[in-house]
Amino acid sequence: MLLQKREENAITLAATATNGRIIEQALPDKYPVAPKKKIIALAALILGLGIPVGFIYLIGLFKYKIENAEDVQKLTTVPLIAELPHCQKPAQGAIVVRENHNDIMEETFRGLRTNLLFMLEKEEKVILVSSTQPGEGKSFVAGNLAVSLALLGKKTLIVGMDIRKPGLNRVFNISHREHGITNYLSDPEHTDLFSLVQPSDIHSNLYILPGGAVPPNPTELVARPVLDSAIAQLKEHYDYIILDTAPIGIVTDTAIVSRVGDLCLYVCRAEVTPKVAYQYINELK
């Protein structure tokens, strides 16, 4: 019986024996087949650089306001003649240019003044100051530029041509705000233009012609030839005339008034002026 079992086991082992045999011993490769470390590192590098750059690019696409001078230079070929630093609201009004002072704001306005004088021809006297929308510092720039010219010894007049919303009233201490250029434009035959001019308490060379009472027809008023006559008269008595005009992106008044100006100074403000506003600048070139 035992012999029979042994024979059966031998037959079973013979039937299940493998047909294969080891010809040569296998050796492990020096480098793994997977994962590919170099490919993973390269992909990580590309994603690590690409995702932040793409994110920043997308943020830039959604920003519709200028941030610095580089944005301005990309959007227009009009020369950038000055960069004003941010100014905290001064304790006394909005005039930061003073005689015998040399802080950074006053030096900046001196630079602006110098550049403008280089751009003006000999007989050109009228500088028009505008912006795209309210809140960009147009009247602030116009007022301090006028003071800077007065400190140069030039007889300077600043005229409030933003007759819908006079900004000079917030810049200067004007005693009779209801009397101004609109009175003359409305009734030139019975109004003395020079009686509307007020001396400034800032400097003896600085004079102010306020906007006056807000008229019901401002656009028609500035379109009249009497404005040309008024500016011609003023040019005979003053070395420089600064026109503080309305924001050109809001109303058409400034485009009409620009006919009497020799040079247009366009004020932009970082984080306020929209990039689309530069279509107005390029149209005014």
Predicted features along the sequence, with ranges:
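Non-transmembrane alpha-helical coiled-coil
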Residues: 1-25, 69-71
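Short, aromatic-rich amphipathic segments at membrane interfaces
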Residues: 20-41
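Soluble periplasmic/extracytoplasmic beta-strand elements of cell-envelope proteins
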Residues: 20-24, 81-83, 128, 207-210
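Short boundary/hinge segments that flank catalytic cores
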Residues: 36-157, 161-182, 186-190, 194, ...
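Conserved beta-strand segments of the P-loop GTPase G domain that flank and frequently precede/overlap
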Residues: 128-130, 210-211, 242-244, 265-269
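Loop/turn-to-beta-strand initiation segments
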Residues: 155, 204-207, 235-243, 253, ...
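Phosphate-binding/switch loop-helix module in NTP-utilizing enzymes
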Residues: 211-251, 258
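Conserved Switch II/interswitch segment of TRAFAC-class P-loop GTPases
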Residues: 245-250, 261-278
